[in-house]
């Protein structure tokens, strides 16, 4: 059963002639033969393998609907998704830095809509601290030691990233330092996009 709020959101989007952002499972028909294969691919992604899908078709053929339906299924499995529509003026395919920026700006998770990248990075920093506390007999109130051990773990985990994307690693380090110093202006300016 669809809640009244969800029903109103879907109907309002359809009135505007747009694809609803959520609740597409209630409208999806004809995807039965694709569903098993796509679910297998989502499970493979959840297990650590990557996947990329591009959808191409004529105007009105259901590309956006299908993409958003698949994104809903992915987010329900705890995956992050991003949707970018390639266009000659807004996001041209030959401008990869623009495509990348749009992908990162529009990352969404089940817990937060578009713009979830900062939360993902902050969650990674939290996971580092949690891992340090679980692996050692560290006193959680010893902030200096916690910070030092977390920095060491971060460097170990960023080692392979630094080889292929040194600017990204440097931005993560600077962003974390700004957060630790409560320098929100610098942290906001360094969001690793």
Q: Language-model segments: what does each one mean?
A:
Residues 55:
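Hydrophobic anchor at the beta1->P-loop junction of P-loop NTPases
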Residues 61, 65-193:
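P-loop NTPase nucleotide-binding core
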Residues 58:
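P-loop (Walker A) phosphate-binding loop of NTP-binding proteins
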Residues 1-51:
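A short, basic N-terminal segment
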